[in-house]
Each structure stands twice: as C-alpha cells, then as structure tokens.
Design a protein with these regions (language model features):
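Cleavable N-terminal export/targeting peptides
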Residues: 1-28
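N-terminal/domain-start segments enriched in small and hydrophobic, helix-friendly residues
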Residues: 25-34, 90-91, 148-152
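C-terminal binding/interaction regions
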Residues: 131-133
C-alpha cells in the first residue's frame, strides 16, 4: 500500500511539473529562508528552512522546500507544494497549499501537506511570509508554522 501511495504521489508531482513547465517563462522565481515550529503528539521542535518558489502562472506556484528540525536527533522534511495565489489589494497574497512530503524523524515516511499562507512585499525584490501546514503520513502527523523572508528574481 505504501508503494502504491508513493508511486501515485510521485506521478502526480511529475505530471503537474510537466504540465506547468509550459508556462515557465510567465512567472517570477524566489528563494527564501524561514524559521518556525513544528508540533506533533510525540515531537515538538524549532526549525530552519529553505525554499525555492516558481510562479508557473500568475496564480499557480510550485514550492519545493527543505526544513531541518532541531530535536535531539537529526530530523528533516523535504516537501513539494503547489500554491494557488490570491492577490489582495495589489500587495498581500494569500494562498492555500497542497503537496507531497518526505519526513525523516524516527522513521522515514512519505505523505501529504495541506495548509495556507500569506505574504507581503517589503520592496520590489523582497517579501515576508507566514505559513501553516499539516504534514500527514501514515504514522506521523505534524502541524508546522513558519515565518520567513524571500528574494524575488
């Protein structure tokens, strides 16, 4: 069952990437760092993360990320999310997100992400953001909050 779920998730990400790559020249890119906190029933920790964002269209953005958790052992999460951007008054943007995740805490597991975020430009090249998402796997469920800054290019 895990293999079927993994294959399905990877196929969906691959298909979305292929479909959206047609629009690559339409959007901007950004790279950012963030800090946050993750909490689960058996795990709570501060985290540091890095992300790359690519606006495939005016409203759809792909966002792969890597988060390192400062627990007693090496813990990290690799995610690939899709954001649907809603501009508000030409400054704020809010977005729901949906994606896939690979977690390495006590065990290695694949799963999904669901959440939302908001961002605000502080200049023509930088923006600040806040995001919350649930990371769901078969044996592990975590809610992660993050605040960050990103550079647009």
């Amino acid at each position: 069952m895990k293999r079927i779920l993994l294959l399905t998730l990877l196929s969906c990400v691959g298909l979305c990437t292929q479909i959206l790559s047609v629009f690559a020249q339409q959007g901007e890119k950004s790279v950012g760092i963030n800090v946050g906190y993750g909490t689960a029933s058996s795990f709570e920790s501060f985290r540091l993360g890095a992300e790359f964002n690519w606006n495939a269209t005016d409203h759809i953005r792909l966002s792969p990320s890597f988060d390192c958790y400062f627990a007693s052992s090496t813990s990290y999460v690799v995610s690939a999310d899709v954001h649907y951007l809603f501009p508000i008054k030409n400054t704020w943007q809010v977005y729901p997100l949906l994606g896939v995740t690979y977690t390495h805490f006590m065990t290695n597991e694949f799963g999904g992400n669901i959440g939302a975020g908001v961002e605000y430009p502080i200049s023509s090249s930088f923006y600040v953001s806040a995001e919350g998402k649930s990371q769901l796997t078969k044996d592990f469920q975590q809610f992660a909050l993050a605040a960050g800054v990103a550079y647009k290019f």
